Amino acid sequence: MIKTIDHIGIMTNDLQKSVEFYTDVLGFSISAKIEMEEVGLSAIFIEKNGSKIELMGYRGAIPKRSEGIEIIMGGSSIPLNDHITFTVDDLGATVSELKGKGIEFGLEPMQVEGGIKIAFFKDPNGVLMELMEHPKQQNKSTEYIIV
């Protein structure tokens, strides 16, 4: 039976640019490199605190990533699509640090149901990234309730 997610794979348009983004901007480290020349695929695994992402480069054409949909929440438009969510201790400090590294946020951080704070940005491939700060008193087994 399933125990846990091993890694998340992301097909990139520019493998080197993606590796630089995840290592230099988000602080991941390279943990493995795989070359499959016979099929035209290169993969670089990056890791941080046990979370792994496989960045893949392909010599053929990469289909355009879905634009997703947008929902209105708290008076702001929030993109809703396939995404990766990173837990942070201090959303404001993390957003400031990433803005200092040239990251643009589509909207300012906001607080949602249950006191959770969120913010969104995209990686160089258009993959939606979400930052999430849980309230200090809450444990990690938070249930999400859509109302």
List PLM regions with ranges.
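A short acidic-to-branched-hydrophobic micro-motif
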Residues: 54-55, 131
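Eukaryotic phosphotyrosine signaling hubs
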Residues: 5-7, 79-83
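Core segments of cupin and vicinal oxygen chelate
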Residues: 11-53
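Vicinal oxygen chelate
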Residues: 1, 44-45, 86, 92-147
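A short, polar/proline- and glycine-enriched secondary-structure boundary/capping micro-motif
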Residues: 64-69, 141-143
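Active-site/binding-pocket entry motifs
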Residues: 52, 59-62, 137
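Short hydrophobic/aromatic beta-strand micro-patches
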Residues: 9-11, 85-89
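Short, P/G- and charge-enriched loop/turn segments at secondary-structure junctions
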Residues: 69-75
